[in-house]
Amino acid sequence: MDLFWDTSAVVPLIFDEQHTLGALQAYQKGEGFFAWDWLTIETEAALSRRKARSFQWEKWSEISKLFQWVHLPQNEWADIRKQNRNWMLRAADAAHLYAFRRVCSILPDLRLVTFDDEQISLASKKGFRLF
């Protein structure tokens, strides 16, 4: 199963928290791993802010190698901003969802892995496939 990951689903793979079980289920069922490349910055910020130990940094390093990274070039930023006028998500969440939608045009069975309530709500309303 091809999965597009949001940061809210990656961090629970590294830290034991509320969504760890769901994240592990997605991780085990995933065959293709996709994410917006900004996820690296968000995840490493989470690791730093939580004062991650060396084994957690190593775990992130291994997980990050699985991903095919989606870049959103500057010439698409206006489209993201325009789309988000309707979506009304936090900026990074809008970009994650925009990148997901873009990859869906190539991989129509792609599923979004997120534990962000606003993303889940919007994705459900828009008919995006969720894990």
Task: Give names to the regions the model predicted.
Residues 69-118, 128:
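Active-site neighborhoods of divalent-metal-dependent phosphate/nucleic-acid chemistry enzymes
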Residues 37-85:
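Active-site-proximal, substrate-binding regions of enzyme catalytic domains
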Residues 8-9, 38, 117-118:
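Alpha-helix/helix-capping structural signal
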Residues 1, 30-33, 66-68, 106-111:
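Short active-site oxyanion
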Residues 1-35, 49-58, 128:
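Short, well-structured N-terminal submotif of metal-dependent ribonuclease cores
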